[in-house]
């Protein structure tokens, strides 16, 4: 099964407090038929950490996961949100942007 959003993709947030922010996908989480993505610089919270042996405590920024339905891949040509399609080129299945037809990977 091919994934429409993969690590390293440039995406834009469609809804929520970080609407219209652009970032790169750090990690894709699939758990119990729910798909979420962690995006750099988006959905950031403060994490208060207690000092432990080997590491000091403090307040750190942490990116939380966003549901995959709230993000869209950026079109490589026009830099707008786009849907993703699949086609076979030279016997290899590739993703392409539906807006411009450009191959994503």
Swiss-Prot record:
Entry-linked PROSITE patterns: RIBOSOMAL_L24
MF term (GO), any: structural constituent of ribosome
S-S bonds: none
InterPro entries: Rib_uL2_dom2 (IPR014722), Ribosomal_uL24 (IPR003256), Ribosomal_uL24_CS (IPR005825), Translation_prot_SH3-like_sf (IPR008991)
Gene Ontology cellular component terms for the protein in this record: ribonucleoprotein complex; ribosome
Keywords: Ribonucleoprotein, Ribosomal protein, RNA-binding, rRNA-binding
Gene Ontology biological-process annotations: translation
Top-level taxonomic group: Bacteria
Pfam families, per the entry: ribosomal_L24 (PF17136)
Assembly and binders: Part of the 50S ribosomal subunit.
Function per UniProt: One of two assembly initiator proteins, it binds directly to the 5'-end of the 23S rRNA, where it nucleates assembly of the 50S subunit.
Protein family (similarity comment): Belongs to the universal ribosomal protein uL24 family.
NCBIfam families cross-referenced by the UniProt entry: rplX_bact
Protein name according to UniProt: Large ribosomal subunit protein uL24
